[in-house]
Amino acid sequence: MALLVRVLRNQTSISQWVPVCSRLIPVSPTQGQGDRALSRTSQWPQMSQSRACGGSEQIPGIDIQLNRKYHTTRKLSTTKDSPQPVEEKVGAFTKIIEAMGFTGPLKYSKWKIKIAALRMYTSCVEKTDFEEFFLRCQMPDTFNSWFLITLLHVWMCLVRMKQEGRSGKYMCRIIVHFMWEDVQQRGRVMGVNPYILKKNMILMTNHFYAAILGYDEGILSDDHGLAAALWRTFFNRKCEDPRHLELLVEYVRKQIQYLDSMNGEDLLLTGEVSWRPLVEKNPQSILKPHSPTYNDEGL
């Protein structure tokens, strides 16, 4: 009989915990130790139900709100607001042959892209004022200094053309190919020993890929990161005047912005690139470049 009375008391205490959306009804304090233990163990599922209903838990002396309002991030600007790399749809066959190291069909003719790449590299060499770099950056007039300046401008062209999809990436490979052909030819004209030239070509190749990684990291970071990349690569960690770094950081930033303003299709078909001066006489003169004139007969 006593056991039956205890069971009935326990059922009564449990039934008093009725979940309500706004709060939980507390148990009367006159219950025994066994009833309190059962009531404490039954609190967790009831609390989860009150959270699901969006209510709050009422505890004597403590007011805890369980229905928290979570922060929702506002929608950022769409991809239409900022230029994005061109994504081309390619078939399975194209993916297979490109995975094997071959180049699939492109948007434009490959021989036109090759000629445009040659023109773009030529603009890096012929349209750059090397004497101004030697003077303002206090660089010696040597073959290594010429290579560092050319490398910087070739990298800026690669950054721009990688935004033009598969055709732009193909053009980047051709630009780099023409650069190494030119470096090797200049070494032969200077009368460098073939063995020494081959050894130096390996060193310059390693320096080229290290510089590309450093410049890419610098252009994606702030001016401190870009200045560090230029100090390590362009100045070979030998720049005593910080104004030279400041000048070069400004030059790279404005030149990248200037190249981004050029039409991608025009660059793929003509390869015509113009460079801003190292020191601007009129800072307001940085305007959108004129569209180039096409000459299909000469292609």
From Swiss-Prot:
InterPro entries: Ubiq_cyt_c_chap, Ubiqinol_cyt_c_chaperone_CPB3
TM annotation in the entry: none
Keywords: Cytoplasmic vesicle, Membrane, Mitochondrion, Mitochondrion inner membrane
Subcellular location, record wording: Mitochondrion inner membrane; Cytoplasmic vesicle
Residues forming coiled coils: none
Annotated effect of mutating W44S: In a breast cancer sample; somatic mutation
Chief localisation class: mitochondrion
A single BP term in Gene Ontology: mitochondrial respiratory chain complex III assembly
Cellular-component GO terms for this entry: cytoplasmic vesicle; mitochondrial inner membrane; mitochondrion
Self-association and partners: Interacts with UQCC2. Interacts with UQCC3. Forms a complex, named COMB/coordinator of mitochondrial CYTB biogenesis, composed of UQCC1, UQCC2, UQCC4, UQCC5 and UQCC6; stabilizes nascent cytochrome b/MT-CYB and promotes its membrane insertion. Forms a complex, named COMB/coordinator of mitochondrial CYTB biogenesis, composed of UQCC1, UQCC2, UQCC4, UQCC5 and UQCC6; stabilizes nascent cytochrome b/MT-CYB and promotes its membrane insertion. Forms a complex, named COMA, composed of UQCC1, UQCC2 and UQCC4; activates MT-CYB translation.
Biological role: Required for the assembly of the ubiquinol-cytochrome c reductase complex (mitochondrial respiratory chain complex III or cytochrome b-c1 complex). Involved in cytochrome b translation and/or stability.
Annotated family: Belongs to the CBP3 family.
Record-given protein name: Ubiquinol-cytochrome c reductase complex assembly factor 1
Organism: Homo sapiens
